[in-house]
């Protein structure tokens, strides 16, 4: 789905949609946060989209339907920020992305035409990942820095919201980063240790060629083939409704312990190894999540998070 288009684009029924009246009913609830969101936008050098903006409405309907359909309204979208690439560095990043898209399109054997033709030939798609505030700031300023970048297709933002409370800032805001990605020719990636394409033939990795749940962009490509474009700011109702929030969340030790019941010994050892690396600050939280997803698969991970989260909620 191309969010950069401003025309009224209907959401595929299979992907889900939400009633616009829902956003209206939440308007009063979030009105006191407007100044805070503008502050975040200014801090990141982004522009906050007005709620009547067509791009805002498209992203809101699409993203809200995915979050609510899986997590029973545990998440609320409170603002959407856009990267306008207004600075000289931003302009350079945008131009570089366009040049690489044309290059990948030519490599596929397609003749470059207009932007739409280039995007189709280079298989430019949208992907998303959950990020912490400081990670987001670093990405927008300096780019991505992990060994590989694992993103979810834009029709499955739930996959990015693992361990949500640990990714919140002090105001309970989580950030979902939507980026344009040059996928080019993809290969199926099974090994968690693979950190670059198996050959020059490939531009990206996926967990499945037919129904991918993960887009994998290598460190050699992540700052040329990925363009951060939108930030969706999300807040949980439990935080909004309580003066001193104690919203249920899943810590990594609890999550790892629950997942271990379904994995073999080598997978468990690998997960504990990665968690130790995170504790020693050798890998970021974002990279730990990416490695965890690669080992367990998203389906199992989502089931565990929902199951444990419901138990924690009952206990509280």
Swiss-Prot record:
Subcellular location: Nucleus
GO molecular function, one term: NAD+ poly-ADP-ribosyltransferase activity
Chain ranges of the PARP catalytic domain: 28-255
Domain RST: from-to ranges: 243-314
One family name in Pfam for this protein: RST
GO cellular component: nucleus
SUPFAM superfamilies reported in the protein's UniProt record: ADP-ribosylation
PROSITE patterns according to UniProt: PARP_CATALYTIC, RST
Recorded superkingdom: Eukaryota
Stretches for region Disordered: 1-28
Keywords: Developmental protein, Nucleus, Stress response
UniProt record, GO biological process: cellular response to hypoxia
Comp. bias intervals (Low complexity): 14-23
Annotated function: Probable inactive ADP-ribosyltransferase that may be involved in stress and developmental responses.
Protein name: Probable inactive poly [ADP-ribose] polymerase SRO4
Protein source organism: Arabidopsis thaliana (Mouse-ear cress)
Gene from which this protein is expressed: SRO4
